C-alpha cells in the first residue's frame, strides 16, 4: 500500500501528484513595490473565475507527476529540509502595519516535489499577482543547498504555506498546508496533531489510492486587525479537479475553517471521500498490543464521534488492528462527525516529546444537505507513532461518474473539545482485559476455567444520577458470542458509572465482533451509543498464560 510511504509522522509527503492547470493564465512581470513580495502581472480573479478554471481543467488530460527538482533539493534529508527557514522579513503581509496575521511559505524539496503556485489577491479590485520563487525569500542555514542550482528558477514555486497569529508572529504557526491536499491547525496549545485533506479518492478500493494536490493558492489581503482571512485553492488529480474556498477564523482557543468546494470529475470514481481526516492511534486504554514503551497511551485521537442525521450520538473508540479494517457507518444528512482527542491528562501519556495530551480534536459540521452515504473509517496496523494509520471521511452513496459536478460546504473545528456534544450520558473511556472472574478477585493461584475477555465502559454526564434510583439498564448487542457477568458500578473519582461485561466466544471464529451498548432507563435511552470492534484470538490462544518460575 503506497499510503505507508506517503504518510510520514503526522504530515504527509506528496509522492504521487499532478500539475496545475493555470500555467498559461498568469505570467511573470516586473516587481511591483505596492504588491509586497508579489511580482507577477495583475489578473482578474474571484471564486467564479476559480470555478471556471477547475471546470475547464477537468476537461483536459491530467498533467502528470511533478517535474524533477534540482538535485540539491531532491536529495535533501529531513533534517536538512527542516533547517530551511522562510525569511520573516519577506512574509506575505509584512508591509501591513499592526497586522494580527501573516503568511510564510514552505520550500520545495525532499518529498515535497509539487511546485505549488501562490498568488496575492486584492479582494476589493479582484486583482491577483503571482508570488514567484526566489532564493532570497529563504534562509538556508546549514541545509547544504547549492543555491547556484536555483538561480533563475522562478517556476519552482513553493511546497505550501503556514499561518502565524499575533503575538506569536513569525514564531509559532497555527495553520499549515503542506503536501498534496493535507492541512492542519492547532488550538490554544500550539500543538499540531491530526491532519485534514481537501479530498480522498479510492482510499479503500481495488485500485491504487489517489492523492489530489492543491496546486495553487490565492490569498485575500487582510486588514491590520483581522483575525479571519480567506484563501482559495485549485485542486487537481488524475480523476477530479476542484475549486476550494477556505475562510479561516484564527481564534484564541481554536481555529475554525469554513470550507466550500465545487468538484468536477474527470473519470468515474469508485470511492470519493469528503472532508477526510488522517490521524494516528498506536495504543490506548482499550488496545495495548503495541504499548511496550514507557508511555501508557500513544495516539493523536482516541475515538470517532458521530452525530447522526436521526439525532443519535455514537462513540466508536479507535483500534490498532492486526490487519487493515474498513467500516462504513450508514447515515443520511449527518449533523457532524470527527476524530476526537478527549483525554487531556498528561499522566495518561507521560510523553514530553509528543505531548499527546495537548493535541486537538477535529469536528466536521456539514453546512448543506449531504444526502445518503456513510462515515467511513479505515484503521491500518502500525508498530509505532510515526505513521498515521487512521483515516475517516464522508462517502456519498451515489457513485461519481465522469463529468459529474458536486459541491459541499462544511465547517471544521480544530479545538480541545468539539463545539457540540450529546445532552445524554457520554462515554469517558473504554478498557479491556482478562475476564472470567468476579471483579476485585483477579486470579491468584488459579485462572478461570473458561477464557473470556472483559470490557469496561465508563459513562459520565447526562441524567445518570437521576436515573440510578429508577434503574439503569445496559443494552448490549453482539454480532457473535455472549455477554455475561454484566455489572453496573458507580465510580466516585470520575462521578460516573462503569459498565462491565465479559465476552465469551460461542465458536472458533476469529472474525471481528461488532459490539453495541447504550444505557436505558424505563425504556428510554439515557446515553450515547458505544460501538466497538473486537478481534478475538485464535482458539489455541484462548487461554491464560502462567509464566511464573517458582523454583
From Swiss-Prot:
Subcellular location, record wording: Periplasm
InterPro entries: Gal_mutarotase_sf_dom (IPR011013), GH-type_carb-bd (IPR014718), Glucan_biosyn_MdoD (IPR023724), Glucan_biosyn_MdoG/MdoD (IPR014438), Glucan_biosyn_MdoG_C (IPR007444), Ig-like_fold (IPR013783), Ig_E-set (IPR014756), TAT_signal (IPR006311)
Processing after translation: Predicted to be exported by the Tat system. The position of the signal peptide cleavage has not been experimentally proven.
The keyword RNA-binding appears for this protein: no
A Gene Ontology BP annotation from the UniProt entry: beta-glucan biosynthetic process
Coiled-coil residue spans: none
Stated name of the protein: Glucans biosynthesis protein D
Gene: mdoD
Amino acid at each position: 500500500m503506497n499510503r505507508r510511504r506517503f504518510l510520514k509522522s503526522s504530515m504527509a509527503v506528496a509522492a504521487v501528484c499532478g500539475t496545475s492547470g493555470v500555467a498559461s493564465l498568469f505570467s511573470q512581470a516586473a516587481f511591483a513595490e505596492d504588491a509586497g513580495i508579489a511580482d507577477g502581472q495583475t489578473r482578474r480573479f474571484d471564486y467564479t473565475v476559480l470555478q471556471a478554471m477547475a471546470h475547464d481543467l477537468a476537461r483536459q488530460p491530467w498533467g502528470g507527476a511533478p517535474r524533477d527538482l534540482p538535485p540539491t533539493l531532491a536529495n535533501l534529508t529531513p533534517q536538512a529540509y527542516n533547517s530551511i527557514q522562510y525569511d520573516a522579513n519577506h512574509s506575505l503581509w509584512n508591509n501591513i502595519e499592526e497586522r494580527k496575521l501573516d503568511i510564510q511559505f514552505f520550500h520545495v524539496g525532499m518529498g515535497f516535489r509539487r511546485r505549488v503556485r501562490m498568488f496575492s489577491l486584492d479582494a476589493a479590485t479582484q486583482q491577483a499577482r503571482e508570488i514567484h520563487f526566489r532564493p532570497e525569500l529563504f534562509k538556508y542555514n546549514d541545509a547544504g543547498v547549492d543555491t547556484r542550482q536555483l538561480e533563475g528558477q522562478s517556476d519552482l514555486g513553493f511546497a505550501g504555506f503556514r499561518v502565524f497569529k499575533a503575538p506569536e508572529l513569525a514564531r509559532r504557526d497555527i495553520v499549515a498546508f503542506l503536501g498534496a491536499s493535507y492541512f492542519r491547525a492547532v488550538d490554544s496549545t500550539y500543538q499540531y496533531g491530526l491532519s485534514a485533506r481537501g479530498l480522498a479518492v479510492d482510499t479503500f478500493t481495488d485500485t491504487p489510492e489517489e492523492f489530489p494536490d492543491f496546486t495553487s493558492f490565492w490569498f485575500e489581503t487582510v486588514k491590520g486587525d483581522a483575525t479571519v482571512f480567506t484563501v482559495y485553492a485549485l485542486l487537481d488529480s488524475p480523476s477530479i479537479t476542484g475549486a476550494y474556498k477556505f475562510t479561516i477564523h484564527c481564534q484564541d482557543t481554536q481555529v475554525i475553517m469554513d470550507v466550500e468546494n465545487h468538484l468536477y470529475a474527470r473519470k468515474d470514481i469508485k470511492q470519493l471521500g469528503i472532508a477526510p481526516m488522517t490521524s494516528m492511534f498506536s495504543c490506548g486504554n482499550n488496545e495495548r498490543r503495541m504499548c511496550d514503551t514507557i508511555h501508557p497511551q500513544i495516539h493523536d485521537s482516541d475515538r470517532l464521534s458521530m452525530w447522526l442525521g436521526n439525532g443519535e450520538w455514537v462513540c466508536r473508540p479507535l483500534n490498532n488492528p492486526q490487519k487493515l479494517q474498513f467500516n462504513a457507518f450508514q447515515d443520511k444528512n449527518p449533523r457532524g462527525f470527527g476524530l476526537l482527542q478527549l483525554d487531556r491528562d498528561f499522566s495518561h501519556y507521560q510523553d514530553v516529546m509528543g505531548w499527546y495530551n495537548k493535541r486537538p480534536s477535529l469536528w466536521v459540521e456539514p453546512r448543506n444537505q449531504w444526502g445518503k452515504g456513510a462515515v467511513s473509517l479505515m484503521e491500518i496496523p502500525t508498530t509505532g507513532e510515526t505513521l498515521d494509520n487512521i483515516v475517516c471521511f464522508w462517502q456519498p452513496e451515489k457513485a461519481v461518474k465522469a463529468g459529474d459536478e458536486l459541491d459541499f460546504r462544511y465547517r471544521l473545528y480544530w479545538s480541545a473539545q468539539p463545539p457540540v456534544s450529546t445532552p445524554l450520558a457520554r462515554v469517558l473511556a473504554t478498557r479491556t482485559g482478562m475476564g472470567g472472574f468476579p471483579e476485585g478477585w483477579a486470579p491468584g493461584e488459579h485462572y478461570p476455567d473458561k477464557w473470556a475477555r472483559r470490557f469496561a465502559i465508563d459513562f459520565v454526564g447526562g441524567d445518570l444520577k437521576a436515573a440510578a434510583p429508577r434503574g439503569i439498564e445496559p443494552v448490549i448487542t453482539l454480532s457473535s458470542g455472549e455477554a455475561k457477568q454484566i455489572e453496573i458500578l458507580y465510580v466516585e473519582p470520575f462521578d460516573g458509572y462503569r459498565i462491565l461485561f465479559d465476552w465469551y466466544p460461542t465458536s472458533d471464529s476469529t472474525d471481528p465482533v461488532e459490539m453495541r451498548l447504550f444505557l436505558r432507563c424505563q425504556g428510554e435511552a439515557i446515553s450515547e451509543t458505544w460501538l466497538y470492534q473486537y478481534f478475538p484470538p485464535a482458539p489455541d490462544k484462548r487461554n491464560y498464560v502462567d509464566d511464573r518460575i517458582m523454583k
